[in-house]
Amino acid sequence: MSVALSFSGYRHRKRLVRSAVDWFVSNFLGKYQLEIDIEDRGLNREGLYGACTVLDKNSRPREFLIEMNNTLDDVAYLSTLFHELIHVKQRVLGEFKTKYDKDYWFGKLIDPDTEYKNLPWEVEAHQLECGIMELYLDELNV
């Protein structure tokens, strides 16, 4: 496992983020060399808890920006962080791809008119985020 992590935000959150990202990458993306920048900032105006953006290339991406809403409490923050890390996993493993501005989920073209909440990568991330957070907290004995 190799992840280069940069973080802008509060010291307490930096420790939380480092631990969670290291755990997630070692459990789900161990063989990949990744660069993940995490920006902790106010996203209330945008109406977001978090966002994940590919920074390098859409084919075999390895560099990501995760923006996190710094007004969330620690539980919501951690859940959102795992949600965004699930998107990193989806991109790295090729489950969710974008080719020529068209989105594919496991090789199937996704209708561009699909509502956000029904996009398959969002459905999966919402389904998994709390369970992954519970696994993480159990391993920490929190």
Question: For each predicted feature, which ranges?
Answer:
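Hydrophobic or amphipathic, alpha-helical segments that drive membrane association/targeting
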Residues: 1-12, 34-47
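Soluble non-cytosolic domains of exported or imported proteins
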Residues: 11, 15, 75-76, 80, ...
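Post-HEXXH active-site segment of zinc metalloproteases
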Residues: 75, 91-123
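Active-site recognition of the HExxH zinc-binding catalytic motif
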Residues: 79-91
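Long, well-structured alpha-helical subdomains associated
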Residues: 115-118, 129-142
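Short pre-active-site segment immediately N-terminal to the catalytic Zn-binding motif
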Residues: 63-81
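Zn2+-dependent metallopeptidase catalytic core
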Residues: 12-33
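Catalytic zinc-binding patch centered on the HExxH motif and its immediate surroundings
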Residues: 39-63, 74
